[in-house]
């Protein structure tokens, strides 16, 4: 009888811990997963229904940090064999962000479902100044402008430590400016990530819509590594105003600034 009583007590305690798991546990997990670069500060509530302030930093021990205004609110519930995450953030998320999280054996899949036919693919917009929290080179560039994210459907899956990306996502950079240039605005840009249905490699494209600072480039995310090559240049008449910025962006080769990652 005592054994059954003890077993019941342990099971009850385990259920209570799962149901009332504090949001701080989720915050700790996010900090560990991102190397301290993305934080849920002042986390309140539980893992299942909570809120926090979103903060970017340059990593553990860094003095650089930047927080978004207001609080991110979320709910997490069961959806069959998966988890359904719903998030709202008045400053930045368009309506409600819905994600489906599918755990598995040595794998985890996060899905952004396609919106209903005719519905907007916009997910939200964030201030470019938020990136300053990541430290170098953003704290030197001091960017301003808006980052608009949209997607018709996207999924990221980690399988035994290897990331596989499918679907499409587009980041529009609007009215970008920097303290390193005397120009009021550098330009407008788009960065596209196109996943591979086979999961081999996701293609990345960077282009300029308009502006004095011309940016182009391409790359791919493959085998959990980012490889990107691009170039930056000044539109005619803007060379002097952009000279310092071009020196910082990449390796100078005449009028060009060459960008290489990975």
Positions of PLM-derived features:
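Transmembrane beta-strands of outer-membrane beta-barrel pores
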Residues: 56, 103, 116, 175-177, ...
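Hydrophobic membrane-insertion alpha-helices, especially the h-region
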Residues: 2-22
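Extended terminal
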Residues: 2-7, 27-33, 181-262
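Short, well-ordered strand-loop elements centered on a beta-strand within folded domains, enriched
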Residues: 81-89, 105-113, 165-169, 202-206, ...
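N-terminal beta-strand/beta-hairpin edge segment
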Residues: 38-140
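Extended amphipathic, helix-rich lipid-handling scaffolds
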Residues: 104-156, 192-204, 233-262
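Alpha-helical transmembrane signal-anchor/signal-peptide segments
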Residues: 23-42
């Amino acid at each position: 009888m005592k054994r059954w009583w003890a077993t019941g007590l342990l099971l009850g305690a385990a259920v209570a811990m799962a149901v009332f798991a504090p949001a701080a546990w989720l915050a700790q997990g996010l900090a560990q997963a991102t190397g301290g670069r993305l934080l849920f500060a002042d986390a309140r509530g539980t893992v299942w229904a909570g809120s926090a302030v979103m903060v970017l930093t340059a990593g553990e021990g860094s003095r650089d940090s930047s927080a978004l205004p207001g609080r991110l609110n979320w709910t997490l519930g069961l959806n069959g064999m998966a988890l359904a995450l719903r998030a709202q953030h008045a400053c930045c998320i368009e309506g409600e962000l819905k994600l489906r999280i599918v755990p598995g054996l040595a794998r985890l899949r996060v899905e952004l479902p396609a919106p209903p036919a005719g519905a907007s693919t916009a997910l939200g917009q964030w201030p470019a100044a938020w990136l300053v929290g990541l430290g170098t080179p953003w704290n030197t560039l001091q960017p301003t402008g808006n980052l608009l994210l949209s997607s018709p459907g996207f999924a990221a899956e980690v399988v035994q430590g290897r990331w596989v990306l499918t679907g499409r996502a587009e980041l529009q950079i609007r009215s970008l400016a920097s303290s390193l240039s005397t120009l009021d605005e550098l330009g407008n840009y788009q960065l596209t990530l196109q996943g591979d249905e086979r999961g081999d490699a996701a293609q990345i494209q960077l282009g300029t819509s308009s502006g004095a600072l011309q940016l182009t480039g391409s790359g791919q995310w493959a085998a959990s590594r980012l490889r990107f090559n691009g170039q930056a240049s000044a539109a005619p008449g803007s060379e002097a105003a952009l000279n310092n910025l071009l020196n910082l962006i990449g390796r100078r080769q005449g009028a060009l600034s060459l960008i290489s990652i990975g």
